[in-house]
């Protein structure tokens, strides 16, 4: 085994360990909530029981989504993910609709900043949806309670940018540097034990497969993750 093969093996093992760490969090939450429901010594109201069951459901969906994204990554080289014109406003609204319940459960709000013009972009719907879901998931755990996370579409030169802005803790330098260097490996951040950066790694991999590029802007009161996509020459009729 030469040095390059050894380094690749170490990188793959590191990615596996970080992925396992990311999976551990939702599974631990599900286990703890299940124990609470089954504890005969703990009195739980009907409303609290409904809330716990909803949290188990949402947490399970997050874990399943993570597994599905990792499966897609393993097939990126072999599978053909077709690129097509996609309405940027529609996919943003779809993501907000899908993840809003998760934000409500954590006393947070996510909204789409409406735009007059519907930009058509060239992308794969499922891959782009996963990118935006991972950006939103990252924003959920880094934003402060009772703050709004905002998804926005804007024009940047010849590209269309979809960004997710959160208001909370400053982005760890380890994740910021990894994105800036286009480092296609998950990065663990000690200041965010609940988020290993695996979602950003997934977003980066999917963006590359679509010929797009992700980036991040650090703010004193949060961060903005974005993806720059090619604009479609086809006119939007919506």
Where are the regions that the model predicts?
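Short alpha-helical segment of the dimerization/phosphotransfer core of two-component systems
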Residues: 58-63
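Conserved micro-motifs of the catalytic ATP-binding
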Residues: 77-82, 120-123
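Short conserved segments within the C-terminal catalytic ATPase subdomain
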Residues: 102-112
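Short helix-loop "hinge" at the ATP-lid/N-box region of the Bergerat-fold HATPase_c
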Residues: 138-140
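Short conserved segment of the HATPase_c
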Residues: 171-185
């Amino acid at each position: 085994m030469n040095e390059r093969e050894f380094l690749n093996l170490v990188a793959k093992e590191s990615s596996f360990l970080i992925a396992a760490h990311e999976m551990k969090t939702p599974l631990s939450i599900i286990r703890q909530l299940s124990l609470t429901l089954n504890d005969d010594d703990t009195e739980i109201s009907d409303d609290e029981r409904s809330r716990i069951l909803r949290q188990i459901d949402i947490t399970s969906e997050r874990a399943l989504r993570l597994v599905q994204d990792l499966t897609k990554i393993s097939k990126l080289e072999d599978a053909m993910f077709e690129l097509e014109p996609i309405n940027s406003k529609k996919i943003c609204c779809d993501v907000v609709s899908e993840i809003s319940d998760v934000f409500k459960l954590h006393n947070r709000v996510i909204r789409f900043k409406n735009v007059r013009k519907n930009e058509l972009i060239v992308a794969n719907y499922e891959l782009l949806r996963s990118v935006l879901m991972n950006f939103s998931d990252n924003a959920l755990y880094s934003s402060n309670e009772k703050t709004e996370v905002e998804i926005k579409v804007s024009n940047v030169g010849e590209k269309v940018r979809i960004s997710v802005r959160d208001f909370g803790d400053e982005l760890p330098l380890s994740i910021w540097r990894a994105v800036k260097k286009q480092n296609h490996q998950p990065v663990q951040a000690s200041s965010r034990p609940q988020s290993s950066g695996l979602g950003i790694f997934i977003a980066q991999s999917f963006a590359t497969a679509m010929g797009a590029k992700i980036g991040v802007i650090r703010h004193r009161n949060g961060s903005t993750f974005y993806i720059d996509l090619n604009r479609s020459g086809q006119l939007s009729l919506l």
